[in-house]
């Protein structure tokens, strides 16, 4: 299995190092390839977008990662989320892959997860972020049907019939924090086609919808369904579970992630060679190494967290601990 994450200047550099460190810490038997796609300079970037820290690059390579440049053809700085799609072009054609957002750590034996490459899937750790239903506008069903129809996909077979009509979970929708498939080139081509359609020539049902920053997550279920995939089965429960943790932002991670996830994060970051690199990124220096993360952790009861993420963010900001 080939693992793909996206590097880049600044924060992404150090998140990539932490991902690689956690993979080697938690799954030393992993024998696949870890590919860090690094955006190359080009007309869609106003300043150099790639990894600039030579020490970080050397440490990634020491961990066995392959840093490979890719070109931004369609998105670049105007939509950085599109990097995860454009980066698929660096992977070898016809070989199964799994993509992870760079703000993820590996907390268990990823090499033992039984990915079924012929049935692509993605993260279900999502909320009702898109579409936003207007009072007099089309509902969930009409919007998602229009998108499926535009790409010639069977809409009915994508539905979760255990959920009521017009409830958002009835309709196939993923978090693009991880996804896997059988062929990155095919996945790349279909994602680009779907994203450009949604951006440049959307169905009329989308006229009131804001597509940013969710463009990748709107296209993802269409591509996965079109390739014969769907919602992940129990074999993949370890992703967003005991095997990987999408921590997103360090203050949020310390506020709400499990004791085990935080212990792995800190253990992976503890070797001196890792510490020397990660301390170059101020939020990691302060949160992980200077104890600010542990102070954030004391503010919250993991068994009784606020329902809305914004409430967690606000509580952290009130204490002066928010950093990214």
Predicted regions and their residues:
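N-terminal anchoring/stem segment of glycosyltransferases
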Residues: 1-74, 93, 211, 291-324
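A glycosyltransferase accessory/donor-loop signature
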Residues: 5-8, 160-177, 181-324
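Conserved glycosyltransferase catalytic-site signature
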Residues: 13-17, 81-85, 176, 213-218
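A structural signal for short, well-ordered beta-strand segments and their strand-loop junctions
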Residues: 35-37, 98-101, 106, 122-123, ...
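Short, surface-exposed amphipathic charged segments that create phosphate/polyanion-binding patches used
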Residues: 80-87, 137-139, 249-253
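Extended catalytic-interface subdomain
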Residues: 131-182
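A conserved donor-nucleotide-binding helix/loop in the catalytic core
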Residues: 69-100, 105-108, 112, 120-125
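Conserved donor-nucleotide/metal-binding helix-loop-beta segment in metal-dependent transferases, i.e.
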Residues: 106-146
């Amino acid at each position: 299995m080939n693992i793909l994450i996206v590097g880049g200047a600044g924060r992404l550099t150090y998140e990539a190092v932490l991902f690689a460190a956690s993979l080697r810490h938690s799954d030393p038997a992993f024998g696949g390839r870890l590919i860090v796609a690094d955006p190359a300079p080009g007309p869609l970037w106003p300043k150099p977008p790639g990894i600039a820290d030579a020490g970080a690059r050397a440490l990634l390579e020491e961990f066995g990662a392959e840093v490979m440049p890719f070109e931004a053809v369609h998105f670049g700085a105007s939509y950085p989320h599109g990097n995860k799609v454009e980066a698929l072009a660096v992977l070898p054609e016809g070989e199964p892959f799994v993509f992870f957002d760079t703000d993820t750590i590996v907390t268990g034996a990823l090499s033992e997860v039984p990915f079924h490459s012929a049935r692509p899937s993605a993260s279900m750790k999502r909320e009702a972020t898109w579409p936003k239903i207007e009072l007099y506008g089309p509902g969930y069903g009409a919007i998602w049907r229009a998108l499926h129809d535009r790409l010639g996909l069977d809409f009915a077979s994508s539905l979760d019939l255990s959920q009521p009509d017009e409830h958002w979970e009835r309709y196939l929708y993923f978090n693009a924090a991880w996804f896997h498939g059988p062929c990155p080139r095919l996945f790349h081509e279909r994602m680009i086609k779907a994203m450009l359609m949604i951006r440049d020539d959307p169905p009329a049902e989308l006229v009131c919808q804001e597509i940013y920053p969710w463009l990748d997550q709107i296209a993802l279920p269409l591509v996965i369904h079109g390739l014969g995939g769907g919602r992940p089965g129990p074999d993949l429960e370890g992703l967003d579970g005991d095997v990987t943790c999408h921590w997103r932002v360090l203050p949020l991670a310390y506020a709400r992630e499990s004791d085990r996830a935080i212990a792995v994060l800190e253990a992976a970051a503890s070797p001196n060679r890792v510490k020397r690199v990660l301390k170059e990124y101020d939020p990691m220096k302060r949160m992980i190494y200077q104890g600010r993360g542990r102070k954030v952790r004391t503010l919250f009861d993991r068994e009784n967290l606020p329902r809305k993420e914004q409430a967690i963010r606000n509580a952290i900001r009130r204490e002066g601990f928010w950093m990214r």
